[in-house]
């Protein structure tokens, strides 16, 4: 059950229903690091919303991380829906939809994302074409 956001802290960008300070805010500020792939994905969405380039780079696998700059963060993100997630021991999958505004038109990004443990921390690796079987890997 999610905790409603209070007036003391705005609601989290990831649409969890929790206050930002008790959700992705602790990750974006460096106070903590997400311990699940879904929490990492939600925090990365919040980083895209707020333009937090250092956080995005830190949470992207070094083998697949592109060169990012502030021009890559101009999209106006509207909301996030986690469709489903599967947490493995070393690999995890999160499927989500993220809505954004393109001019006057609202569009949705639908992605199945691969996350892996790298140096004992979850990192985003890449989008996948379909749901793989990850078992306990």
Question: Which residue ranges define each predicted feature?
Answer:
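Core segments of small alpha/beta cavity-forming domains
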Residues: 26-68
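A short, polar/proline- and glycine-enriched secondary-structure boundary/capping micro-motif
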Residues: 34, 104-107, 133-137
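Short, surface-exposed charged micro-motifs
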Residues: 11, 84, 112-114
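Cysteine-centered loop/knuckle micro-motif
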Residues: 22-24
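Short beta-strand edge/turn micro-motifs at domain boundaries
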Residues: 111-137
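Short, flexible, mixed-charge glycine/proline-rich loop motifs
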Residues: 1-7
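Surface-exposed, charged secondary-structure patches
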Residues: 72-108
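Short Cys/His-rich zinc-binding micro-motifs
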Residues: 8-18
